[in-house]
Amino acid sequence: MAARYALGLPRAAPVGQMGTTLSQRAGSSLEFKDHRSYEPGDDLRHIDWSAYARSDVLTVKLYREEITPHLDLLVDTSRSMNLEGSDKGGAAVALAAFFAAAASRSGYSATPWLLGAECRPLAGGHRPPAQWPPFSFEHRGDVTPNLPLFKARSTRVLISDLFWLGDPLRFIRPFGEGAASATVIQLLAQADVEPPEGQSLRLVDSETDEVKEIHIDAIAAKRYRDNLARHQQFWHDACRQVGAVFLPLIAEDVLAQWNLDALVAAEVLRVR
């Protein structure tokens, strides 16, 4: 079923005749591939003067860099992403592998990144997902907002539960800067969304190991759901400010059904 999907085409870049995505910026590769019409602000060194002499129309040469789209895929490695008794960790890895495979089917190059105290490339991430090393969800505390310099005009996807403190814009601004498209997938376990009402629980903070005994009555459950909805709205608003897509998914539903209609509706994916 997963093979039905390819990455959606970024709205910020037109579709080329070769079936890949063309950036509006001039590339630096020496390998010439195609033309497009001149636009104000284009590098004059890339104008095809021979074509202009023949047609009296200004055109710009496109190079391989401009027609090789790229996916930057960030996976949150916080301890909360591997919630005990849930499928969240497995779903995060499965989604990462799915996006990498969809990128390959779409003619994209891809770089998987591990997000924690720093944002670093996954060792062996250039290989097929089946050959990736195991993911380790061991980071404690907030993830770094100091992101690397991603490839210009890349498609960017973040997979995280977003259980971070602070203003979402502190992360989402550098994440979306210069991207062809940016998508934030909030991956939650069912237990993250619906606390077990009417039960007494022994909770262990995944970040600090602090232990707390609590009873979840109807009032506490409603307070939790309201706080989660407020947190999600903060992230939704931040994403909208920078032109990113925000999508919540439930880990158990992803693994059981692979229903990705929400990603297709948001044009993050397309059906081949």
Regions picked out by a protein language model, each given a short descriptive name:
Residues G27:
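Glycine/proline-rich, flexible active-site/cofactor-binding loop segments
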Residues M1-Q24, R36-R45, A51, V60-R272:
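Exposed, interaction-prone extracellular/peripheral surfaces
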